[in-house]
Amino acid sequence: MANFDHIEVHVKDIQKYIEFLKIIFEGGENKKLSDEGTSMFKSPEGLFIEIKKINSNNMPQLAGFCQPCLRKTNAKQFIEDNNLELLNDAESPNGKIYFFKDHEGIMWHLKDYQDRDWTNNW
């Protein structure tokens, strides 16, 4: 059995991204791991995200996340309140899903409900 350890994100501004993660997760803490600024963020629920500086704009496979997804009630209001770029929305059996970009141009989506979907509730 494998156990989840952490996800990694490569961004232009590490400290600004830590502050963004604290907004999106409504809290959290972080530790600097290296002199280059590499840091580890820990969400209130214990999700670890390692944040590194992008080495090259020519390497998109080493940049950003691939559409992180969170569940949050009042998702659209949260996106608007934090001046995030709303891209579009979709319907699911449980409710609305909102797609947005953060300040680094990384696309996220927020499910506007708390119950897990059939895709990850097993």
Name every feature range the model reports, one short phrase each.
Residues 2, 36, 93-95:
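Loop/turn position at the start of each blade in beta-propeller repeats
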Residues 18, 50, 60, 77-79, ...:
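Intrinsically disordered, low-complexity acidic/polar segments
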